[in-house]
């Protein structure tokens, strides 16, 4: 070792020791883990059982060992005084103790924590050395309420009530001992005397948390200073605990005297049933009195307007007898109270506003309890002002020009009103529309005032306000006001103001926003936009933007012909105009292209007599269809747009299988010629990675096919395929599909459930119900002796039946619990017919109601946990019939004294109508009344409750055809009609409301809806649709047929509420349509309190049989395996077809549905026509309003990388699987018929689903057809074998043999194994099997130490029909896989001159897939051995990893000295290295690089990216430059004008120029790019100068000069011969390399210390060789340290190789006196640079002998699978743990077949954050993960994983780990009997190989029968 190296090493060690010492000193209290004792919450006694909250000690860091989380601690922690309970680590930071019963109150405790129970990797506060002290919550009592109670029914019952609440259950005996109740007298000197102790009783609340103390009854007090006092002694304690109260609790209640009756008064304003204001005098008495007694002894006097002092405000002391003699007596009208005695009494009266009353009550009334007044009492009450109101009546803005033309104004309590009328100038109308921020009837123009666009008139009105409480109606005739020459028709802005005192305001509409004086009671002004016109307008906008405008006469209800309809733009231009035709319709093309000043704002409609308008695109004018069934698929605006139906052959695939996709593409209108249109097919993995891209060109028929073989490492989960069309440089998806990729097993069974009672679509009876489960083999025979498990759930439901969709049935359980009954049924075994019977008795749950029974059954394979499932539901009811009703009336809005009829039917369980007698119809009125109710304290009070009072009862009989029943509407109110049977059980209940004048305002807000019913749901083109319409009133309507546009329309008139209308469908209409009806009220109708417009929509379909291609598919009904079957497809037209057949067991797993493609092309489309209108704004005529006035008023990239890491963590010894039984014909031509053939696999038995889809050659007809072929041999073997085993595992396997012959068979069964397995016991069996029956044979196998896919061969010999011996053979495979995932190990060490170092192999690996080698060299090329091995074994996919993996071949392939190393790396013969061997790796990179390059020449991390990555682009360029310099052959096309290489250089030039705000990392990549350009002799002087300038301006010299950016710049300047600049820049780099660096570091932004060191070494060795001696020893030591600590990734490995290669070029030396020995023998081969040895044995001690005069380096590299699980857990930067428990969370090591175990995986990082971690969790053999669609996504949600994959033998999860623990839970199912080893769970960082963790060996888990 030279002096320089020694000094360097010594300095490094010294620095390291110094840093370590500093670190130890920093382990102080500030950095230690702290803890906090959270206060214990008081037990929640409201829960049942009570919820006792635990003691929780929270730590500031992950204090729990990860293996202890969620587990009970039984030692290492104690509590004093002792208390039974459980200590549990609830998380890694929370330690809790929960007592068995409850916490004693106010108890001090001490907790001692032994640090053995804590995470040993952390440093803890010194406070943990002391006991942790805490105190439980103290017992407290609170006096909540106290009052003197007078019983409302018994006058002599009066006493005090005190309510106390307690924090904990009180000790009853102690409480009653601590309690005193006394009658006391309180003196004026604050003393008191006890008059007498009182008896008391105590009522306790639930769980003794509340107590009501009721004193004994007392007489009325003789004086007003008597009290009932309660005292609770402070010595009171809780039932559990010893702490007492802090002080005594004392409180008292005053005892009233006999003369304590008093009252207070007030006058309020209330609304009466006529909607008028009236005065009500309220008297509030201190005790309950009788109203009829008060009425006799009360007087009211209207005082003079002014007091004797001439003041308007009266005071009580001003009232004298003299005043009263001059006062006027006021009559009072008593209002009834709900009870005889009441505290509040009320009287109607009528006095002038602001006048005062004197109320006098004589002392001749006695209150309940004997209370009286000493003498007559009086009080003063003054009347408030009546509310003021002025406003327009009704909602709307349109007055018919043919009608009365009167606007109705309602006023109250105003003497005068002012009406301002602004006539909008027609040319200014556009401003009103364009600037309106409000709605139509109340516009808000913002800054623009109406004065600017209108001509104004003003009219003042004086009103007779003698009765300010009454409403006055004014009918304003606008025609008379504007009686100038012009007609009154037009558009007006009206504002009405009450009592206006400022008539000369500059701007009339200053209160355009609502008047600030308005409040809840008063309205001083109102404004409205009024249109006087006879033109109603409806506009319908289609999906393509075309417009249909309908114009009708408001007065006549008829379409208006010849009206001018103009589209007005924002600037007032007429951009379109036309006349309506005889149907009142005008059509416009799309207005979408009119923009800015020409943007359309309204339709202006005019005739010679009338003018109207409709704003365009105003939300308040659009009809809201959200309450109708208008949802569905949205059609494209372009009828010629393409739509594609993508389908696959089976819905689920295993990795490495071929996906077959059929594509049917059609234009939306089926008219466009499709031939040769290019489309793009993209296929994405579950992580969103583009896996396949293919351009297809459409066939003329529209049928195409794409096939793609999935990678062997294909991600599991849901894959996505899409078809894109390119339009104007944009890609649009026109079709897509999803499918599953899973390592699944096809089903072998099928299952079906039936019930013994035939119920059709009705229900079954609850008694004598039997569910029969039929289990069958998929090859058609009963599955005998199979276990079947079942459970049932009973839920209430509201019965509904499709054939009686309009009838409402009843369920009296509908408000009860969601689940009525749930149970597991006894396990059954199938009989010879494959049936298992489950008797079900639901009698006790039936009652007189209906429930839905959900019956779930699982049928299991023989002695296996694999099962098939089914769910069957049926309605259950004990009733022999159910009653339903329907009505055409709106039952929430029935007018008084108008007929309303409901129709009743009764149906039996078969849903046949039947007659029912002896029913009763009881009418009940629902109202709230006061009901005497006992309180929790024991006292009685009146409470308001909803009750139902019987009004009348009638008998009812329902006929077999149904019976009409007329509802009673004679009186307004809320009613229920209850139907009951002869046993008084409710069988239906109808709620309805009768609306009277008092609630007409409610009716006005009601949303009126048409009821529409079509005569059927599906029609043929050109057929007539019959529509039954029920409207709220008579009127006129418009019917339209709509979907994406209006296809047909028809006007109609209805003189009654109900009518039947008809409209004809167009001939060319296909698919889904909507009947849309707008119905406007007749202006002469009396129904003015509902909206003038009602509307409704109902969908329908037109069948598409004319598009259906007639197909017939023939296949053999039954064949045997190995035979060739023919499928014949016939068509009535020349066609293109796809024929495919699939094993039904696969389709069953996938849930595959063979659907009709026509239903895809003709789905339920959404209603996309937008309807705008003004008909809902029509105001009622003034005369109609006055009729009622008499009675009423108005994925990021890191995640993608993680996905691709899966390959390295999969099972390389996975079993060989059979090819799926599936056939795909590809597209074939059919001219009449076509026959294709398929050979059935030799060992397949099951059912083939045969399917075909075809399109006619012209593409206008489409069909699909399916059939089945049964494949069944005479003797069928069905083995049950685990999918995987681990060496040493034992498992029972079995074979079920089905004898499908007609005679009994004696079968000789023999099983043979491969070396991976051995038998325990015999391998041959003799079995007797009855004809058409099954039997089984059992074997026991054990896995040996041989890894790999192993085949078990079963041979069954039997006699065929000719009595010849025949063999039936079945092969089944399983995987014998190692217990640990793949491991890498590299050991690098320096050997001093003249020394020998002997080292054992780091790991003991299985021979299979093992690679072990040693390299020894005087140059540090030994370092290259480890990283090269790692790179070539790393499964890489992203661009950086792909380039890194190819780098060893680029650097070494042309150097003969590296041939042994390359031989080992490529695993090929030496003569092939440099040719075929390198081609495999390099061609992979060369093939993928074009897909990673963007159109701009740069490169993305993955393919199909839009943006390139700076570093990746430079790195690829570096790779290409190195390859070209080393004379590797690159594709010639890359060097063309737009070739890959030249485009890469262009991208380098582009990205070498810095941008403002670049980070240091970005400038580093730009400098890297500039360096590479310099290598290519392209002088990037400007870029270099700009980078340098930006570095100096934005970053400190300390920051950037020690960064890699400085090295790249120095190298570039050196090549440009600017040595002074180069030397200045390289000097800080050299200093950085010899300086110490932090021990802790991470990878970020393509940089870490190892990448930095190797990059700098590369630059110095290549460009500054003279400086190499300054850094080589120190930097090589660091690199060795990092490699030995496994702290390398693909990029750092590649950069190390580049550096070592450059170093070797400067240190060429001959190999001398170096040997690699084993047991004293030389085992290496020599090259000019190093000695190399392949190591073949499992265990070897390797000696490295250095007999030279200089130091040498050796490297031991191993890649493979460890033979044994580690006995100790490993935690390097990560901690990981996994547990197996049952459902209750108890650890388990033994389960029964079919049981589910619950897996919990926990992970956390030792630092704050570790990115890109992969977890590999191998399942024990004999278990399978419970997979279901979406399972991967569920796992992701549960612990924020980036991706989770479920494989056949393991779970792979990718995530970022944090200091906070993450938890993943999933489930495994025991499917095989045996004893299986539990593999450790393994986690590692994908970028920092030193960060990893695994759990210790956990022994075995046993699965038994």
From Swiss-Prot:
Stored InterPro entries: A2M_N_BRD (IPR011625), Alpha_2_Macroglob_MG3 (IPR021868), Bact_A2M_MG5 (IPR041203), Bact_A2M_MG6 (IPR041462), Bact_MG10 (IPR041246), Macroglobln_a2 (IPR001599), MG2 (IPR002890), Terpenoid_cyclase/PrenylTrfase (IPR008930)
Lipid sites, type S-diacylglycerol cysteine: 22
Membrane topology of this protein: Lipid-anchor
Gene Ontology CC annotation, any one: plasma membrane
Compartments reported by the entry: Cell membrane
Keyword set, alphabetical order: Cell membrane, Lipoprotein, Membrane, Palmitate, Protease inhibitor, Signal, Thioester bond
Signal peptide coordinates: 1-21
Location of cross-link Isoglutamyl cysteine thioester (Cys-Gln): 1438-1441
The keyword Plastid is assigned to this record: no
Residue numbers with lipid attached (N-palmitoyl cysteine): 22
UniProt keyword Mitochondrion present: no
Function: Protects the bacterial cell from host peptidases.
Name of the protein this chain belongs to: Alpha-2-macroglobulin
The species this protein was found in: Pasteurella multocida (strain Pm70)
Phylogenetic placement of the source organism: Bacteria, Pseudomonadati, Pseudomonadota, Gammaproteobacteria, Pasteurellales
